[in-house]
A protein has these predicted regions:
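Bacterial N-terminal signal peptides
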Residues: 10-22
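N-terminal cap/lid segment of alpha/beta-hydrolase-fold proteins
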Residues: 37-88
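Gly/Ser-rich "nucleophile elbow"/oxyanion-hole loop immediately N-terminal to the catalytic nucleophile
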Residues: 84-88, 145-190
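Short beta-strand element of the alpha/beta-hydrolase
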Residues: 87-98
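Cap/lid segment of the alpha/beta-hydrolase catalytic domain
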Residues: 103-105, 109-165, 216-231
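Primarily recognizes the serine-hydrolase "nucleophile elbow" in alpha/beta-hydrolase
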Residues: 168-240
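Short beta-strand/loop motif that positions the catalytic acidic residue
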Residues: 254, 260-262
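Catalytic cores of secreted or luminal carbohydrate-active enzymes
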Residues: 265-267, 271-302
Length: 302
């Protein structure tokens, strides 16, 4: 089963990035949520740090938090070591971790060895080794995900706002590189990273493929967090959270192929919500793989 999963994931991504699917068209202006997408499409200031073999440490700008600037740490990996751009351009992948995760160097390196330029960022305000960065954004925890706010503006202090912006900006960093084919960039995320992948796929129509693993939408209806978090909101807070932060509000606007992958008995993202997420995607773009025995975890090497 391990090899079957690998074949499904790699095959879908390769086909999409090689142009086997219809490419996305212009952005649907009617669904931008909390984000200034035009600003996120632009390359932010990047600090290029140590490079070791295929992998380089970088920092790029995040969204302001309570009036103060933030930055995002990431590993960027290239298929070939050295500063010179290759004669041909590479496809690229944005790699989005989940709860308890970090910027996984090995994940970026894995995709570089497959022939991609890849970026794996930290979405919990940390630097290398999960050490808290003084300029980092909000940490990933249940309280910051299910952020209780009494206005749309206040929701910008929550984790989802900052994490989605960081993922879209990571795409922009990749697209700015001379060795990257900006028309062949995809995104994949695991668990909460899959949740983010669903949102980003509905917002960032530059993407050519999206692969959320475990993560999905309709968390307000049936998920590990429904009773203890979503149902504790006031009706107004719940409406606001669903409208701005649940993937169900964005999946209908996906314009690239999207492959949903989950285990048959996932303990966090339940299959009924997973199925509804798949069904919300426009016809012809959604693909679904439910795997017996797939355990929940950061299984990026499978």
């Amino acid at each position: 089963m391990k090899s079957r999963f690998t074949s499904t994931l790699k095959g879908t991504i390769v086909c999409a990035l090689l142009g086997a699917f219809t490419p996305g068209v212009g952005r649907a202006a009617e669904r931008t949520g909390m984000w200034d997408l035009a600003a996120l499409d632009k390359t932010s200031k990047v600090q290029w740090d140590e490079r070791n073999g295929l992998v380089q440490e970088i920092y790029y700008a995040g969204e302001p938090l309570r009036g103060k600037p933030t930055r995002v740490f990431a590993y960027l990996a290239r298929p070939a070591a050295g500063p010179a751009a290759p004669a041909r351009k590479y496809p690229a992948m944005v790699l989005v971790h989940g709860g308890g995760g970090q910027a996984f160097k090995a994940w970026a390196e894995l995709w570089a060895k497959r022939g991609y330029v890849a970026i794996a960022m930290d979405l919990s305000g940390n630097g290398p080794g999960k050490v808290r960065d003084a300029g980092g954004g909000p940490p990933l925890n249940n309280e910051n995900v299910f952020f209780h706010a009494d206005s749309d503006e206040a929701m910008r202090d929550g984790w989802t706002y900052h994490a989605v912006a960081a993922v879209i900006r990571a795409h922009s960093v990749l697209a700015s590189l001379p060795e990257v084919d900006a028309d062949r960039i995809g995104v994949t995320g695991i668990s909460w990273g899959g949740y983010l992948t669903c949102i980003v796929a509905g917002l960032d129509h530059r993407l050519k493929v999206a692969v959320p693993v475990y993560g999905c939408g309709y968390l307000q209806e049936d998920s590990y967090w429904t009773k203890d978090f979503v149902d504790q909101m006031t009706p107004a807070q719940k409406e606001r959270w669903v409208r701005l932060c649940d993937p169900s509000s964005y999946l209908a606007h996906v314009q690239c192929p999207i492959l949903f992958i989950n285990g048959a008995n996932d303990p966090r993202f339940f299959l009924d919500s997973h199925r509804r997420s798949y069904e919300t995607v426009p016809p012809g773009l959604g693909h679904l793989a439910i795997l017996i025995g797939l355990k929940h975890g950061h299984n990026f090497a499978i």
